[in-house]
Structures are given as C-alpha cells and as structure tokens.
Amino acid sequence: MALTADEKTQIINEYATHEGDTGSPEVQVALLSKRIADLTEHLKEHKHDHHSRRGMQLMIGDRRRLLDYLKRVDINRYRSLIERLGLRR
C-alpha cells in the first residue's frame, strides 16, 4: 500500500524540474496523486476503513492547495501537470 523507494524515486525523476528536485509542487502533487490512487483502490475493498478514508481526504486537500498555488504562480506549469497526471479540473 505504501510507496516503495523505487516507485517514489521513479515519480520524482519523472516530475522533477531540475536535478535533485524533491520539493517542487509538481513532484509533491505527483506523489500525493499516487498515494491517493492506491488508497482509492484499498477503500474499494475495505469500505468501512474510515481512518484511511480520512487520511485520503486530507491528502486530497493538500493536493488541492498545491494545485491552487501552482495555478496562481504559473498557469502553464499547472496545465501541463494536470494533463500529465490526467486529473479532472
């Protein structure tokens, strides 16, 4: 369920804006999106796992705030990221 180190490294390398980038909004949103997708699959089987559901809702809020920030700062990077991740907006 948790991201393995290899998965995390692969996502970071794919969405990094420069070498050694682990904190840009793009990387953070991509990592959150992967964790949200994994939790969504978990919750399809375990419908009464409310603790995990709340954690997922908090992650969705974090991702929303990061996307709002990116949209406010650089609309082109925002649009590119939304398209690459396949998020609805």
UniProtKB/Swiss-Prot annotation:
According to the record's subunit comment, the protein's assembly and interactions are:
Part of the 30S ribosomal subunit. Forms a bridge to the 50S subunit in the 70S ribosome, contacting the 23S rRNA.
Gene Ontology CC annotations of this record: cytosolic small ribosomal subunit
Regions that span the bilayer: none
Question: So what does this one do?
Answer: One of the primary rRNA binding proteins, it binds directly to 16S rRNA where it helps nucleate assembly of the platform of the 30S subunit by binding and bridging several RNA helices of the 16S rRNA. Forms an intersubunit bridge (bridge B4) with the 23S rRNA of the 50S subunit in the ribosome.
Gene3D superfamilies this protein is in?
A: 6.10.250.3130, S15/NS1, RNA-binding
Its gene name is rpsO
Give the InterPro entries listed for this entry.
Ribosomal_uS15, Ribosomal_uS15_bac-type, uS15_NS1_RNA-bd_sf
One Gene Ontology molecular-function label: rRNA binding
Q: What keyword terms does UniProt attach to this protein?
A: Ribonucleoprotein, Ribosomal protein, RNA-binding, rRNA-binding
What SUPFAM superfamilies is this protein classified in?
S15/NS1 RNA-binding domain
- Protein name according to UniProt: Small ribosomal subunit protein uS15
Regarding protein family, the annotation reads: Belongs to the universal ribosomal protein uS15 family.
Q: Which GO terms describe its biological process?
A: translation
